[in-house]
Amino acid sequence: MDPNCSCAAGVSCTCAGSCKCKECKCTSCKKSCCSCCPVGCSKCAQGCVCKGASEKCSCCD
């Protein structure tokens, strides 16, 4: 499996527990695209960069 979980937007896919999902655009992905974004953040797949897990992700505003 691609370590970045990359696939077409909206396509069903699964992410491994160790996956960072940096490129994941799948609606079925159970993990956030980055550590400080909530699961389901639609903007997260659009180049979100987090400074830290405890900080709010600006792209999710």
Swiss-Prot record:
Disulfide bonds: none
Keywords assigned by UniProt, alphabetized: Acetylation, Cadmium, Copper, Metal-binding, Metal-thiolate cluster, Phosphoprotein, Zinc
Positions bound to a divalent metal cation 4: C33, C34, C44, C48
Residues reported to bind a divalent metal cation 6: C37, C41, C44, C60
Pfam families xrefs: Metallothio (PF00131)
Positions bound to a divalent metal cation 1: C5, C7, C21, C24
Domain of life: Eukaryota
Biological process according to GO: cellular response to cadmium ion; cellular response to copper ion; cellular response to zinc ion; detoxification of copper ion; intracellular zinc ion homeostasis; negative regulation of growth
Gene Ontology cellular-component annotations: cytoplasm; nucleus
Presence of keyword Cell membrane: no
Region Beta, residue ranges: 1-29
Binding site for a divalent metal cation 5: C34, C36, C37, C50
Entries under SUPFAM superfamilies matching the protein: Metallothionein (SSF57868)
Record PTM N-acetylmethionine, positions in chain: M1
Keyword Acetylation: yes
InterPro entries reported for this sequence: Metalthion_dom_sf, Metalthion_dom_sf_vert, Metalthion_vert, Metalthion_vert_metal_BS
Binding site residues for a divalent metal cation 2: C7, C13, C15, C26
List of residues binding a divalent metal cation 7: C50, C57, C59, C60
Region Alpha, annotated ranges: 30-61
Subunit details: Monomer.
Family as reported in the entry's similarity comment: Belongs to the metallothionein superfamily. Type 1 family.
Domain notes: Class I metallothioneins contain 2 metal-binding domains: four divalent ions are chelated within cluster A of the alpha domain and are coordinated via cysteinyl thiolate bridges to 11 cysteine ligands. Cluster B, the corresponding region within the beta domain, can ligate three divalent ions to 9 cysteines.
PANTHER family, alphabetized: METALLOTHIONEIN (PTHR23299), METALLOTHIONEIN-1F (PTHR23299:SF55)
Function: Metallothioneins have a high content of cysteine residues that bind various heavy metals; these proteins are transcriptionally regulated by both heavy metals and glucocorticoids.
This protein's name: Metallothionein-1F
Biological source species: Homo sapiens (Human)
